[in-house]
């Protein structure tokens, strides 16, 4: 299955859940960095008060969401950068935010990119993941996945299977609209230590994989 089909052929929350366990990698020109997606959030577009495209808001900053599914949308908050992929057809501005990966490739380089932070601190959050990839700009914003150094491996035989996938509310969402703030649109591997804010007491055997 190609990216255009994968990111448009079902609802955005279904796409987000299916991404759990798939390899996400970034080729920095020297080697492949990355790991298995363990946490991701769906943003449902114009009706979603937490989405950057809520109410049809469109600007150069969020243009990536309006492109066809499979387009990279990188946005910045202060000095931090976040990796999203647009979902659905062009002008239907939905997307998925990848929040965390379980490192598997280029771990030593990712630790170096994180200024020596190791263990769960390498990639247990969306900005940390981008730092681990050595990304400090929006250069790959608006590129289609297949035309970028990013790869999401869609081969099912390369996907790791979680013992349990949890659906929960998204992180850091404004509570002014409790309906959207509390929608269970964040998916993660139960007990995986790289999930943001996972408590040590909740760590699962084998990081939550089967």
Swiss-Prot record:
Query: What UniProt keywords are attached to this protein's entry?
Result: DNA damage, DNA repair, Hydrolase
Concerning Pfam families, the annotation shows: Pur_DNA_glyco (PF02245)
By its UniProt entry, which InterPro entries does this protein fall under? Formyl_transferase-like_C_sf (IPR011034), MPG (IPR003180), MPG_sf (IPR036995)
E.C. number: 3.2.2.-
Q: In Gene Ontology terms, what is one molecular function of this protein?
A: alkylbase DNA N-glycosylase activity
What SUPFAM superfamilies does its record include? Answer: FMT C-terminal domain-like
Q: Which CDD domains match?
A: AAG (cd00540)
GO biological-process terms attached to the record: base-excision repair
Q: Which HAMAP family does the protein's record reference?
A: 3MGH (MF_00527)
Family indicated by similarity = Belongs to the DNA glycosylase MPG family.
Protein name per its UniProtKB record: Putative 3-methyladenine DNA glycosylase
Q: Which organism is it from?
A: Lactobacillus acidophilus (strain ATCC 700396 / NCK56 / N2 / NCFM)
Taxonomic path? Bacteria, Bacillati, Bacillota, Bacilli, Lactobacillales
């Amino acid at each position: 299955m190609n990216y255009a089909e994968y990111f448009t052929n079902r609802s955005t929350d279904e796409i987000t859940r299916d991404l759990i366990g798939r390899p996400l990698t970034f080729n920095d020109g020297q080697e492949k960095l990355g790991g298995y997606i363990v946490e991701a959030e769906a943003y449902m577009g114009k009706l979603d008060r937490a989405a950057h495209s809520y109410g049809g808001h469109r600007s150069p900053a969020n243009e990536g969401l309006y492109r066809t599914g499979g387009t990279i949308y990188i946005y910045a908050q202060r000095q931090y950068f976040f990796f999203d992929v647009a979902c659905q057809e062009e002008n239907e501005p939905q997307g998925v935010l990848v929040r965390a990966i379980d490192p598997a490739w280029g771990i030593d380089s990712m630790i170096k990119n994180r200024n020596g932070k190791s263990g769960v601190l390498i990639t247990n959050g969306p900005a940390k993941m981008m730092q681990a990839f050595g990304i400090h700009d929006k250069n790959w914003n608006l590129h289609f996945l297949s035309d970028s150094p990013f790869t999401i491996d869609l081969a099912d035989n390369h996907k790791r299977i979680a013992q349990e996938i949890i659906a929960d509310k998204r992180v850091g969402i404004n509570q002014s609209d409790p309906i959207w703030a509390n929608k269970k649109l964040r998916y993660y591997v139960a007990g995986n230590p790289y999930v943001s804010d996972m408590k040590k007491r909740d760590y699962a055997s084998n990081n939550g994989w089967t």
